[in-house]
């Protein structure tokens, strides 16, 4: 059969017409269908025979394409059609088809990894693409580091200290696109606009994501301090929210998102997220989060030592101040520190316009100096006031990035 076909095949270039090529394409399609049928039936001999015929047709079409540039207008269909045919079509498609397999592969890759392709399109950095894949694979720590490196020049400093999934907030500061793509991955396609709604209504998806993030980060937070950390995450959320200034909004979205997850992970936290999100006042955040469970504040002492190795004493003191009670904390944020009204107003806290807030602005910028600024500024009771921020920012931004 193959011999008969070979003899019937047109030989001269002048004989090649669109009808001839279309006829050959139709025959190729028929051959492919036959090959598939025989493969499903297990008839390898017939499959081999038809594959040889198909191979000759493809080689002939490739020869026409190479020899006659004018035929390119007639040949786009064969490569596209033959691409999906089978191994024979790919291997024998020739130069014109050689380009299509790559396109198909790239499409497959981008389709299989929509977050990665989205990230790559938004940021335009190859490393982000890789890091997104890693995120999908639950290697959040590694992802955070690579994201920090590629998305922000200052990010790597944080990735060293705590390469956990929490580096996402810092990514959000760099660009909303980063933040959105990271949000898609971590939240499983939950849009940023839905975060506030989700805070009030935890979803099963959030709980799953939170559980996975908790497992990924748990090695870094030894002991009970980990849960304290997740609770602590809620405190900054409210503060960050009102402080939506410039990039802090992006960061804020991440913080709220994480606070939602963490608040859901601990039953007592849900009311907190619901209450202080609407108001966005640090007072609410502190009253609810830090005072719902004082044991959780104590549990922070251990993690603070882990996080702030350089300033353990200061942070532990701050924690002690927290543990002292709701009344004191409120007075701290509201009365004793009018100069640091970053807590009551919170917007000022992040606003780069004020002295203490400069720490936060630096933090928004993702600079490693924040730790130093936190420690220095946190001398005396003011340190206690800032400590929730310093700690939580460390956990969400500085540390985990």
Curated annotation (Swiss-Prot):
Tissue-level expression: Brain (at protein level). Also found in the heart, liver, kidney and testis.
Compartments, record wording: Nucleus; Chromosome, Centromere, Kinetochore
Residue ranges, annotated region (MFD domain): 251-322
Pfam families (UniProt xref): SSXT (PF05030)
One cellular-component annotation, GO: nBAF complex
Domain topic, free-text comment: The MFD (multi-functional domain) domain is involved in transcription transactivation, nuclear body targeting and dimerization. Inhibits dendritic growth in cultured neurons.
Protein name: Calcium-responsive transcription coactivator
Protein's organism: Rattus norvegicus (Rat)
């Amino acid at each position: 059969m193959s011999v008969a076909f070979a003899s019937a095949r047109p030989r001269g270039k002048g004989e090649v017409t669109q009808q001839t090529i279309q006829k050959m394409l139709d025959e190729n399609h028929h051959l492919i269908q036959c090959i598939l049928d025989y493969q499903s039936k297990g008839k390898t001999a017939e499959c081999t025979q038809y594959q040889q015929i198909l191979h000759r047709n493809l080689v002939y079409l490739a020869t026409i394409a190479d020899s006659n540039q004018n035929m390119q207008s007639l040949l786009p269909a064969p490569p596209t059609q033959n691409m999906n045919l089978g191994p024979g079509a790919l291997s024998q498609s020739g130069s014109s088809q050689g380009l299509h397999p790559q396109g198909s592969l790239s499409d497959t890759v981008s389709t299989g990894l929509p977050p990665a392709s989205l990230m790559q399109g938004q940021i335009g950095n190859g490393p982000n693409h890789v890091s997104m894949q890693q995120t999908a694979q639950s290697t959040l720590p590694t992802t955070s580091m690579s994201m920090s490196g590629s998305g922000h020049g200052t990010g790597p400093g944080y990735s060293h200290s705590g390469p956990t999934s929490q580096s996402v907030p810092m990514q959000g500061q760099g660009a909303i696109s980063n933040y959105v793509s990271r949000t898609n991955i971590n939240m499983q396609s939950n849009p940023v606009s839905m975060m506030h709604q989700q805070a009030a209504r935890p979803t099963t998806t959030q709980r799953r994501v939170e559980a996975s993030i908790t497992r990924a980060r748990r090695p870094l937070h030894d002991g009970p301090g980990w849960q304290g950390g997740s609770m602590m995450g809620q405190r900054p959320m409210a503060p960050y929210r009102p402080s939506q200034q410039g990039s802090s909004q992006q960061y804020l979205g991440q913080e709220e998102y994480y606070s939602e997850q963490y608040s859901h992970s601990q039953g007592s936290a849900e009311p907190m997220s619901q209450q202080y999100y609407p108001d966005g006042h640090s007072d609410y955040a502190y009253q609810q989060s830090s005072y719902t469970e004082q044991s959780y504040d104590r549990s922070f002492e251990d993690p603070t030592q882990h996080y702030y190795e350089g300033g353990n004493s200061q942070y532990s003191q701050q924690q002690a101040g927290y543990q002292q009670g709701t009344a004191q904390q409120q007075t701290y944020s509201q009365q004793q520190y009018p100069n640091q009204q970053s807590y009551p107003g919170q917007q000022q806290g992040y606003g780069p316009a004020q002295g203490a807030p400069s720490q936060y602005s630096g933090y928004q910028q993702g600079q490693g100096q924040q730790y130093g600024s936190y420690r220095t500024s946190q001398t005396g009771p003011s340190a206690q006031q800032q400590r929730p921020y310093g700690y939580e920012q460390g956990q969400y931004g500085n540390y985990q990035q």
